[in-house]
Each structure stands twice: as structure tokens, then as C-alpha cells.
């Protein structure tokens, strides 16, 4: 899906909210920000790689005898996850489109939350059976799901950090937790452009997340959980 993002004009930038103290402080802050930006330069590759690799790794293990992967249960879901993960990293590295990359990362997180809730629901249903305790102990989460969650968080966090750095560099503002939080809210409220229309980034994330959930609900894993 081709999409471009534009930050909301009405929201104050983090740079405006965090003014530098003295010229020497501003210069020192710029050095720290530039150093951090260099350190984060390759991080989106790591996040995207974690998301992509997760679809080939087990998410759930049944009695250590049968492993379930995204690739096995739904090719459509597998391709969608790979596309979103790669597109998010591309938006960060090539387009510097942090609104879009964060929105895609949030969509992956929405899917991760729903998948985990479904997993917990499965355990609750299994425990109600005659051999519930034994059966539920045989079902466990595997590295695939954790790798996916880590990759999605990586893409979201890096988007927030890099966008904050871009906002703070001109004035040499200091990087702080409250600034990062305000930047995150700004990214969520910003606009994502789809063709000729613009939608809030949170709405874009919700729609993409729902699409992933729908693919999951049609997958073999969900049928197996019933």
C-alpha cells in the first residue's frame, strides 16, 4: 500500500516545547543528538528483520511435539506482516517518514495484543476440559511471538526517537522523557495521506491492525484454537 504521511500542523513540535538553556548547552545537546542518531541508524533494519523472521519461527508449541508458525497457518497473514515490517523500516530509513513508520509499528502491536488475548482465551478454554491442567501446561508461547513483539516495539520506539531528534536538532533542545512522550502523541495524532485523503495516524494503525486480525481469524491457527 503506497502511503505518505504529513505531521499535523496544529500540534506543537517537541523542539518548541523543550528550549535549550545556553548556547554551550545547545551545542552539547546537538552533539549528543547527532551521536544518538548515528547509533540508531541501523536499528530499523534490526526491527524489520525481527518481524520478518518471526513469521518463520514457532509462535506456539503444543506439547513440544508440534510447533505452529505464521507461515504454516496463513500465507496471506505471513505476507502482510512481512510487507508492513519492511515498509515501516523503509519509511524510516529512506523516506524519513516517521509518522507512517510509527503507524505501521502500532498496527503490528495491535495485532500482537489480539493474538496474545486469543492465546490466553485458548488456555482458559483448555483448562475447562477434563484433562485441562495437563493440556494447558503442554501449550506454551515460543520465540516467534516474542521476536515479533520485540521487532514491532523496535520500529515504534525508533520512529519516536528519530522524529524527536529531527525536531530538537535545530535549536539544540535536550532529549527527555516528557519530550519523547509528547512526540509520541504528536505522531499518533498526525495525518497519514492515502491517495487523495488524509486520515489520523491512529486510525491508519487501527485499520491495518484490524486487517491483520481478520487474516488471523481466518487462519488455521485460530481454527485450531477453537
What are these language model-derived features?
Residues 19-20:
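Cationic, low-complexity basic patches in intrinsically disordered or flexible, solvent-exposed regions
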Residues 1-13:
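Cys/His-rich metal-coordination motifs, chiefly Zn-binding "fingers/knuckles"
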Residues 23-226:
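Compact integral membrane and secretory-pathway proteins
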Amino acid at each position: 500500500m503506497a502511503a505518505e504521511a504529513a505531521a499535523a500542523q496544529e500540534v506543537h513540535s517537541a523542539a518548541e516545547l523543550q528550549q535549550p538553556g545556553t548556547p554551550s548547552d545547545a551545542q552539547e545537546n546537538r552533539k549528543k543528538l547527532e551521536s544518538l542518531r548515528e547509533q540508531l541508524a541501523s536499528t530499523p533494519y534490526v526491527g524489520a528483520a525481527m518481524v520478518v523472521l518471526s513469521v518463520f519461527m514457532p509462535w506456539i508449541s503444543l506439547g513440544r511435539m508440534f510447533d505452529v508458525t505464521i507461515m504454516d497457518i496463513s500465507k496471506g497473514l505471513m505476507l502482510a506482516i512481512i510487507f508492513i515490517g519492511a515498509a515501516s523500516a523503509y519509511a524510516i530509513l529512506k523516506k524519513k517518514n516517521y509518522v507512517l513508520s510509527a503507524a505501521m509499528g502500532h498496527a503490528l502491536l495491535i495485532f500482537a495484543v489480539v493474538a496474545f488475548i486469543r492465546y490466553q482465551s485458548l488456555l482458559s478454554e483448555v483448562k475447562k476440559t477434563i484433562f485441562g491442567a495437563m493440556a494447558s501446561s503442554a501449550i506454551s508461547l515460543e520465540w516467534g511471538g516474542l521476536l515479533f513483539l520485540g521487532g514491532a516495539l523496535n520500529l515504534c520506539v525508533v520512529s519516536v526517537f528519530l522524529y524527536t531528534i529531527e525536531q530538537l536538532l535545530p535549536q539544540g533542545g535536550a532529549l527527555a522523557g516528557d519530550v519523547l512522550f509528547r512526540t509520541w502523541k504528536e505522531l499518533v495524532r498526525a495525518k497519514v495521506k492515502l491517495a487523495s485523503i488524509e486520515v489520523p495516524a491512529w486510525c491508519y494503525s487501527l485499520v491495518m491492525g484490524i486487517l491483520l486480525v481478520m487474516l488471523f481469524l481466518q487462519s488455521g491457527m485460530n481454527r485450531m484454537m477453537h
